[in-house]
């Protein structure tokens, strides 16, 4: 069942008024592939635009807080925790992991996915002048906890 469609097939924001407030968490990831020289430049702090990981981290945090402004039917949420981590993996990839949490009436999956996506886009933006071959790949939900649908972990059947 698609919860954002009414009986006539019209899109609407889901009414969560009567739902209990529960602890909810979500974790998402994104990967960015680049030339080894680009990753080395980032790691050594020699990028002309500054600390790429720090800027991407802040962009991801800001994006999570603005998810409802970007995705039309998302509820505005009072997130109580947002964490965005970037790490070099191998010689040519960066892994971005975003975690969001709150005590509320709706989940935070879209916030975590938005944080990871915007952090990846920011990394791309900051590095495109030195590497036109950047590739953003595998943006996905890793884990979701809380709420009516319970616990989900990537790789598990729904």
Curated annotation (Swiss-Prot):
Superkingdom, natural source: Bacteria
EC numbers, comma separated: 4.6.1.17
A molecular-function term among this protein's GO annotations: cyclic pyranopterin monophosphate synthase activity
Signal peptide: none
Residues forming the catalytic site: 125
PANTHER family linked: CYCLIC PYRANOPTERIN MONOPHOSPHATE SYNTHASE, MOLYBDOPTERIN COFACTOR SYNTHESIS PROTEIN A
NCBIfam families: moaC, PRK09364.1
Family from the record: Belongs to the MoaC family.
Record-given protein name: Cyclic pyranopterin monophosphate synthase
Organism: Azotobacter vinelandii (strain DJ / ATCC BAA-1303)
């Amino acid at each position: 069942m698609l919860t954002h469609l009414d009986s006539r097939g019209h899109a609407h924001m889901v009414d969560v008024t009567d739902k209990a407030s529960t602890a909810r968490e979500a974790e998402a990831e994104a990967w960015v592939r680049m030339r080894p020289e680009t990753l080395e430049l980032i790691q050594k702090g020699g990028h002309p635009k500054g600390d790429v990981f720090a800027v991407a981290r802040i962009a991801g945090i800001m994006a999570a807080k603005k998810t409802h402004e970007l995705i039309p039917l998302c509820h505005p949420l009072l997130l109580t925790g947002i964490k965005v981590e970037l790490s070099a993996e191998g010689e040519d990839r960066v892994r971005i992991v975003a975690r969001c949490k709150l005590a509320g009436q709706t989940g935070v999956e879209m916030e975590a996915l938005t944080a990871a996506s915007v952090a990846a886009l920011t990394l791309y933006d900051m590095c495109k002048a030195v590497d036109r071959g950047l590739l953003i790949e595998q943006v996905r939900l890793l884990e979701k906890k809380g709420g009516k649908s319970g616990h989900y972990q990537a790789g598990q059947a729904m």
